[in-house]
Amino acid sequence: MPKANNAVASKARRKRVLKKAKGYWGSRGNILTVVKHAVDKGEQYAYRDRRAKKRSFRSLWIIRINAAARLNGTTYSRLMDAMIKKNVEIDRKTMAEIAVRDPEAFTQLVKTIID
């Protein structure tokens, strides 16, 4: 009796890993052992950077709000302090969008918060 080696599942598993490595250069895209390492490392970077993305966007929003606040005669920290004291609940993402897209509205917002 011939040896059963479950070739269908093995081929499917290899194909799945190789599909993830589409576009990789050289042996990183076609030699299975190298592909496995490359794909694993790529997934580690993706996991790490999904979290780093959140941090970098928050800091971008803060930079934009601070720049717009300084054009209106205050600073980011003073603006946030005044917002907390007046119970104004606008998130940083929205404030940064207003600051970039509609500076006049941001000026009005700063005046209502600070005064």
From Swiss-Prot:
Belongs to the bacterial ribosomal protein bL20 family. GO terms for cellular component: ribonucleoprotein complex; ribosome. GO terms for molecular function: rRNA binding; structural constituent of ribosome. The keyword Cytoplasm does not apply. InterPro entries: Ribosomal_bL20 (IPR005813), RIBOSOMAL_L20_CS (IPR049946), Ribosomal_protein_bL20_C (IPR035566). Signal peptide: none annotated. This is Large ribosomal subunit protein bL20. The gene is rplT. Pfam families: Ribosomal_L20. The keyword Ribosomal protein applies. One of its GO terms (biological process) is ribosomal large subunit assembly. Binds directly to 23S ribosomal RNA and is necessary for the in vitro assembly process of the 50S ribosomal subunit. It is not involved in the protein synthesizing functions of that subunit. Keywords: Ribonucleoprotein, Ribosomal protein, RNA-binding, rRNA-binding. It comes from Chlorobium luteolum (strain DSM 273 / BCRC 81028 / 2530) (Pelodictyon luteolum).
